[in-house]
Amino acid sequence: MSDSDNNTKSQQNNPTQTDEKSGEEIQSNQKPQRKFTAVLNKKKEKLNEDLSELDKLKQQLAHFQNQFRLAVADKENVKRIMQKNIDDTSIYAISNFARDLLSSCDNLETSLKNLKEDDSIHAGVLMTYKELLNTLERHNITRIDPIGEKFNPQFHKAVSQMTDEDKDENTILHVVQPGYIIKDKLLRPASVIISKKSD
């Protein structure tokens, strides 16, 4: 009989020996599996911690991006407000000076109406008047001469009414004194005579 036959017979004769060996084999196989499971669980735990940290960082990033957008918007608002203040200040500074010049324009215009065209000084007064109007226009000061327009209390001052059946009521018939605006701000309203229907 060979040794292997003897081992087989001895194993068959002694079943507890076979059970002990297979139990040891199972235990020795379970040790690496437990280690693997423990390592895997630690890795999962670490991954969950990292994912949680990533979520926190994403929330912080979104918060900082929102803060940045708000800061940029605030900066743009401040810039726009400052530019408007600068524009308003320059308009205000020019307004007082321009208002003083308007009486000179009115005087030159009155002189032109009273002078005859063949009068020797008419050409000089006309040239001075046109140059003054051009200077005002270069500084965004525009003349309001609203004949035929509908009366607008924002830009016109009614000094009188005149009956006119051909025109709609409150139509400007005559301009007594022209008005002026600087950019979109009223410098002086136009003094006007407006139409009315007969009673």
Swiss-Prot record:
GO terms for molecular function: adenyl-nucleotide exchange factor activity; protein homodimerization activity; protein-folding chaperone binding; unfolded protein binding. GO terms for cellular component: cytoplasm. The keyword NAD does not apply. HAMAP family: GrpE. Residues 1-36 are annotated as: Disordered. Homodimer. GO terms for biological process: protein folding. Participates actively in the response to hyperosmotic and heat shock by preventing the aggregation of stress-denatured proteins, in association with DnaK and GrpE. It is the nucleotide exchange factor for DnaK and may function as a thermosensor. Unfolded proteins bind initially to DnaJ; upon interaction with the DnaJ-bound protein, DnaK hydrolyzes its bound ATP, resulting in the formation of a stable complex. GrpE releases ADP from DnaK; ATP binding to DnaK triggers the release of the substrate protein, thus completing the reaction cycle. The keyword Chaperone applies. Keywords: Chaperone, Cytoplasm, Stress response. The lineage of its organism: Bacteria, Pseudomonadati, Pseudomonadota, Alphaproteobacteria, Rickettsiales. It is found in: Cytoplasm. PANTHER family: GRPE PROTEIN, GRPE PROTEIN HOMOLOG, MITOCHONDRIAL. Residues 1-17 have a biased composition (Polar residues). Pfam families: GrpE. It comes from Ehrlichia canis (strain Jake). Its main location: cytoplasm. This is Protein GrpE.
